[in-house]
Amino acid sequence: MKNKVFLIGMPGCGKSTIGELISKELLLKFIDMDIYIEEKTSKTISELFEQGEDYFRDIESEACKEIIKYDNVVIATGGGVVKKGINVETLKNNGLVIFIDRPVEKIISDIDVSRRPLLKNGKERIIGLYKERYDIYNKACHKIVVNDGTIDEVIEEIKKIIINN
């Protein structure tokens, strides 16, 4: 079993919820990268984005370098972590990267945009991000899990992947 598991995917695909549940079931530590960044900087993700997306992405890259030091951990990354090639390389070289692929229609129906700075422009923005990032997520991962069933089904599938790798 890999001792570091990185969950990647669109905002609203279930990374944080699924990651926390899996970590409890497998007795692993759980880190939500956005919360890690907020605690480290004493600012919300929205506040950091107010200083520019590039500024935020630099902080996110630093967080990637820091979180790989943890062992026996499931990490829910930020949705845009894959935008920087160095982050993809860091994650892929240091653990198992799983892309949680949730159909964009389900993300739109489930998501609370108030906590997601890049999604405040609504449905069109989410669809645009999905199209922009889909291939990047596919290339950045070791495994893909489609999240269009029940949460229990997704958790079981991911647990099997983790245990068998």
UniProtKB/Swiss-Prot annotation:
Pfam families: SKI. ATP binds at residues 12-17, 116. GO terms for cellular component: cytosol. Substrate binds at residues 34, 57, 79, 133. Its main location: cytoplasm. Its EC number is 2.7.1.71. It is an enzyme of class 2 (transferase). GO terms for biological process: amino acid biosynthetic process; aromatic amino acid family biosynthetic process; chorismate biosynthetic process. GO terms for molecular function: ATP binding; magnesium ion binding; shikimate kinase activity. Mg(2+) binds at residue 16. The keyword Chloroplast does not apply. Its cofactor is Mg(2+). It catalyses: shikimate + ATP = 3-phosphoshikimate + ADP + H(+). Keywords: Amino-acid biosynthesis, Aromatic amino acid biosynthesis, ATP-binding, Cytoplasm, Kinase, Magnesium, Metal-binding, Nucleotide-binding, Transferase. Belongs to the shikimate kinase family. Catalyzes the specific phosphorylation of the 3-hydroxyl group of shikimic acid using ATP as a cosubstrate. This is Shikimate kinase.
